C-alpha cells in the first residue's frame, strides 16, 4: 500500500525514483478504492490443490481481491469432481464480456506436448487475445509462460533434455523494478518443468525486462515494459510437499526421475522437505497485485482501454 506524505516533501522524489508508491495528500484526498477483480484460469489437473495454493498467496495483501475461477473448457476432469467444477468454476462464455483487473494462468503438465497438440490450444489463444482488451495485467505461470511467449512473441517451444526439478537460487537484475520491490539480491524458488527459458535467447527475441535469472534454471521472472504481461517460469505457489508428490508420482510411473535439487535435507527423499521459497512467493504476488494491477487499473473497469497503458522505458 502507498505511504501518504505532504505534496512537496523532499523525500518524495527519492522514494519515487526507487519505485516506492508515494501518494501525495492532494491525490489521497480524491482516491477511490474498490475490490480488485482477479480471474484464475486453472489448467492444473488437481484443481482444488492448485486453487488453494494460489488463493493463499493472493490473500497476503491489504488489498481486497475478489477471485473468480475459470475453466478452459467443459471436458470432464480426471482429478477434480465435476460437482466442484460446476459449483465454483465459470466457463469463458460467461465472463468474456466483462473486464478484470488481473488474470492468472497456471502451469500445466504439458512440457513435452507440442502446442498444436494441446486439446485446448485454440481456447487458450482466444483467452489470451481477449485479455489484451479486457485485463489490466496477466500473470503467466510455468507452462503458461511458455505458451504466452509463443502467442505474444511467436517464440518456438524450447525443451530441456532432462526435466528441471528442484529449488534454485536466482539473482535479480533490475533492483528498482516494482516487481522486485523488497526482494533479496538472491532468492530461492522451485521449478518443475521441461521448458527452457534461456536469458540470451529471450533478450535477443523480445523486448521483455528480464528481472531474475538462475545459472541453472535460466530466466525466472520477466515482464513487458507496461507490466501488463508478467512471466514466472517456476512455481512460487507450490506447497512444501508438491515437488515430493511429483517425484513419488514419477517414480511410480517408472520414469526414474532425478531427486529434486536442493529440496530434501541431505538430498535424502526420506527426509522432510523444507519450503525455503514461501516468503518469496508471498512477496512476488503482493508486488504484482500492488504495482501491476492496483496502481495501473482504472477505478471504473467499464472504462478499461488498452490506450490507457504506456510502455515505461
From Swiss-Prot:
The active site is at residues 142, 235, 237. The keyword Cytoplasm applies. Coiled coil: none annotated. The record marks 111 as: Important for acyl-CoA specificity. NCBIfam families: metA. Transfers a succinyl group from succinyl-CoA to L-homoserine, forming succinyl-L-homoserine. This is Homoserine O-succinyltransferase. It comes from Vibrio cholerae serotype O1 (strain ATCC 39315 / El Tor Inaba N16961).
Amino acid at each position: 500500500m502507498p505511504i501518504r506524505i505532504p505534496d512537496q516533501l523532499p523525500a518524495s522524489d527519492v522514494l519515487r525514483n526507487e519505485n516506492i508508491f508515494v501518494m501525495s495528500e492532494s491525490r489521497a484526498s480524491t482516491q477511490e478504492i474498490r475490490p480488485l477483480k482477479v480471474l484464475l484460469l486453472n489448467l492444473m489437473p488437481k484443481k482444488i490443490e492448485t486453487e488453494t495454493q494460489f488463493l493463499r498467496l493472493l490473500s497476503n495483501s491489504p488489498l481486497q481481491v475478489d477471485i473468480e475461477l475459470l475453466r478452459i473448457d467443459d471436458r470432464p476432469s480426471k482429478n477434480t469432481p465435476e460437482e466442484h467444477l460446476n459449483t465454483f468454476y465459470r466457463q469463458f462464455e460467461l465472463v468474456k464480456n466483462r473486464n478484470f483487473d488481473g488474470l492468472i494462468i497456471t502451469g500445466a503438465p504439458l512440457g513435452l506436448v507440442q502446442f498444436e497438440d494441446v486439446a485446448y490450444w485454440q481456447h487458450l489463444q482466444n483467452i489470451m487475445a481477449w485479455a489484451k482488451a479486457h485485463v489490466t495485467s496477466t500473470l503467466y505461470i510455468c507452462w503458461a509462460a511458455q505458451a504466452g511467449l509463443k502467442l505474444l512473441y511467436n517464440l518456438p517451444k524450447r525443451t530441456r533434455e532432462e526435466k528441471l526439478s528442484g529449488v534454485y537460487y536466482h539473482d535479480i537484475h533490475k533492483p528498482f523494478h516494482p516487481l522486485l520491490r523488497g526482494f533479496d539480491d538472491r532468492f530461492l524458488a522451485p521449478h518443475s518443468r521441461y521448458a527452457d527459458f534461456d536469458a540470451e535467447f529471450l533478450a535477443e527475441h523480445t523486448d521483455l525486462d528480464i528481472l531474475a535469472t538462475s545459472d541453472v534454471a535460466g530466466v525466472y521472472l520477466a515482464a513487458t515494459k507496461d507490466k501488463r504481461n508478467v512471466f514466472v517460469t517456476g512455481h512460487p505457489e507450490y506447497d512444501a510437499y508438491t515437488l515430493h508428490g511429483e517425484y513419488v508420482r514419477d517414480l511410480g510411473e517408472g520414469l526414474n526421475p532425478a531427486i529434486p535439487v536442493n529440496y530434501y535435507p541431505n538430498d535424502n527423499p526420506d527426509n522432510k522437505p523444507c519450503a525455503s521459497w514461501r516468503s518469496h512467493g508471498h512477496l512476488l504476488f503482493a508486488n504484482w497485485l500492488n504495482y501491476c494491477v492496483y496502481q495501473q487499473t482504472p477505478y471504473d473497469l467499464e472504462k478499461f482501454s488498452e490506450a490507457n497503458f504506456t510502455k515505461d522505458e
